[in-house]
Amino acid sequence: YDTEPVREKGDTTIYSDVGAIMLGELIEKESGLPLDMFVDSLIFEPLGMSTTFYNPPEEKIKRVVPTEIDPKGNLIHGYVHDENAHSLGGVAGHAGLFSTAKDLAIFSQMMLNRGLYGWKRIFKQETVDLFTTRANLVSQSSRCLGWDSPSGASSGGIYLSDLSYGHGGYT
């Protein structure tokens, strides 16, 4: 595409799915595995996260909480509703995962332990630090590489610790 930037480099941060989508594509290219198989075998299975998946199988749909209503008034149940992820078959680097509170607690504990859960090392400490520290590519930006950090403008407002990080979104 041949388009001109709408802002000068370093001027502002605008959230976009494109970076995470490209990361998913890069993982597939470099690993030789589809993204869902890659994250399942290297992250979810070692952590025992048995109820986290892309495109939930029919037998697990009943465990998925409906989160949207389609234009006809039907609940969207176990179906990715992010348009970009949908166009990529429900498996993408930025959206499409379904999980449970238990599995999210496991993943969160691993992140709080800087990549370690039990005796299993999932990420290097330096990788977790890199992903959860403000990138400072733009002055006053709260963005980390893959996460967001507290700012007065965030949905958490003043209630989040300066050490917290997270990412809002939907499937």
Regions from the PLM with identified roles:
Residues 1-166:
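Short, surface-exposed loop or secondary-structure junction motifs
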Residues 169-171:
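Short, small/polar residue-rich loop motifs at catalytic or cofactor-binding pockets
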